[in-house]
Amino acid sequence: MSNLRILILLLCVIALPVAVFAQEPVDSTNENSVEDRIESVAENTDAEIDYSSLTETLKYFKKHPINLNRTDREELEELGLLNEIQIDNLLRHIEKNGALISLYELQSIDGFDLATIYSILPYVKITGDESRKTWNFNEILNQSKSTLFVRYTNILQEQAGYAPITDSALAESPNSRYLGSDYKLYTRYKFAYYNMLSFGVTAEKDFGEEFFSGNQKQGFDFYSAHFFIRDIGPLKALAIGDYTLQFGQGLTIWSGLSYGKSAEAINIKKSGRGIVPYSSVDENLFMRGAAAQFTLKPFSVYAWVSRKMLDANVQAGDSMNTEEFVITSLQESGLHNTQSTIVDKDQISEFVTGARIEATIRRVKLGTTGYYTRFGQSIAPGDQLYEYYNFSGNENLNVGLDYSW
């Protein structure tokens, strides 16, 4: 009998650390959670992407965690940490079994491994006061947040483009030296009331660009501003200024951040967020104008209009071309720090207008999107074999159909 007691006591001692671990509260205040997520996304893409919009989204949900028992598909898609199958399984589990009683219950849902659960823990909860946010002026003043961010970057080693050069050498190779100073300056101001209202201004000067001098007397080389409001009756979203559009899988139209490759094949499928306010510094991947979404369940209707200037290479038209100048290619670097890049700046206008209608019935979404694009000058790609299927002309009409379940 004494041996049995010793055995039971020994088993209790061994099991104690496991039991204690299981009772530890969930640490949802991991200070590195946002940085870890950005690093994970960066590891799965080869492109140089500005992650400020993703960072802002994660920081918002870290401060205002999603109540999983009261959430919907759109909010979970906005978080960007779960794929379509995981979102479906979570919503079906709650619909079938009722509200979650513990975050550890996520382990019983198909598709939620420990890595996924740990990645979303800082941004979710299952309890708390969930009184609906209202459009009250006093509440907007008391609960809103203003953020001013300034970043200065400089490379200590002298770069070749800033080294002294003789006038004769510069005349022979005018693009061998940068026109401006050797630092990068980025500043952003944003006012936000939860995720319902935001407006802000972003400005950036790249390495080698002039600042309040020469060709940049207006100061920064790039300015961006937006006003965004949502959830006012049937008006689901309204964006004025700079914004991005994300629909379907991006074959018809998609602007802004998009996750590319992934180690998991299941993560290839995208989750479009519709109309998204733009506050990043990429000088190409956005719309400039206005966009609106109206919802009358089960239908949602989107409409948008945009006009902005694009950088492009310009060449004189030949004798067979009715236009005096043609565009041979569009420039996407956003840099304006040499003679040639200054010449290419804002050479062509882009006008875009379009609409989308989608229907969501339970977990089935069906949508159709169409938009018209007109450029200020004709685009005439070169005659190389790899350019054979490149766009040519100055007008384009895109129409697409997408579905998801």
Regions found by a protein language model. Give the residues of each.
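Bacterial N-terminal signal peptides
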Residues: I8-P17
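Long, highly charged, low-complexity intrinsically disordered interaction regions
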Residues: Q23-L81, I85-R92, T127-K133
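Sec/Tat signal peptide C-region and signal peptidase I cleavage site
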Residues: V18-A22
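Outer-membrane beta-barrel channel domains
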Residues: E78, I85, L91-R92, K96-A99, ...
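Short, solvent-exposed coil/turn linker segments
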Residues: N3, P65-N67, A99-S102
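Bacterial N-terminal signal peptides that target proteins for export
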Residues: M1-I8
